[in-house]
Amino acid sequence: MASEPNLRYPIEETGDRGPPGPPGPPGPQGPPGPQGPPGPQGPPGPPGPPGPPGPPGPPGPPGPPGPPGLPGLFVTNLLLGIIVLLLLIIVALLLVSKLVVN
């Protein structure tokens, strides 16, 4: 029985090999790779528009006091008034005495 040929696995006949067959179809796409690291930070954006104007400020402190009044001017005017009044009285008396003499 040992001399019986094994029909399951036939013996390959020797001879010239034929040309290679065409390449097979491409394989299926592989699974996606892991997520890459985050990219570098982008440049800063342009400046924003100017904001609205602020509310009006509080009122300022009161100003310094004014210069002192001039009481001397009042006294001078009073004295000048009295002198002019006396001169008018003198002139009136002179006129009256001149009229009485005539």
Swiss-Prot record:
Biased composition (Pro residues): 19-70
Region of interest (Disordered), residue spans: 1-72
Cited InterPro entries: Collagen, Collagen_superfamily, StpC
Cytoplasmic compartment segments: 1-72
Top-level lineage group: Viruses
Keyword annotations from UniProtKB, A to Z: Collagen, Host membrane, Host-virus interaction, Membrane, Oncogene, Repeat, Transmembrane, Transmembrane helix
Membrane topology: Single-pass membrane protein
The UniProt record lists the keyword Ubl conjugation: no
Cellular component aspect of the GO annotation: extracellular space; host cell membrane; membrane
Residues passing through the membrane, by range: 73-93
Span of domain Collagen-like: 15-71
Biological process per Gene Ontology, one example term: extracellular matrix organization
Extracellular side: 94-102
Pfam families from the UniProt entry: Collagen
KW S-adenosyl-L-methionine (keyword) present: no
Compartments, record wording: Host membrane
Any GO molecular function: extracellular matrix structural constituent conferring tensile strength
PANTHER family: COL_CUTICLE_N DOMAIN-CONTAINING PROTEIN-RELATED, COLLAGEN ALPHA
Subunit text: Binds to host RAS and TRAF2.
Other remarks on this protein: Saimiriine herpesvirus 2 transforms T-lymphocytes, including human, to continuous growth in vitro. Two viral proteins, Tip and StpC, are essential for this function. The virus induced transforming activation is used as an important tool of T-cell biology, including HIV replication.
Protein name: Saimiri transformation-associated protein
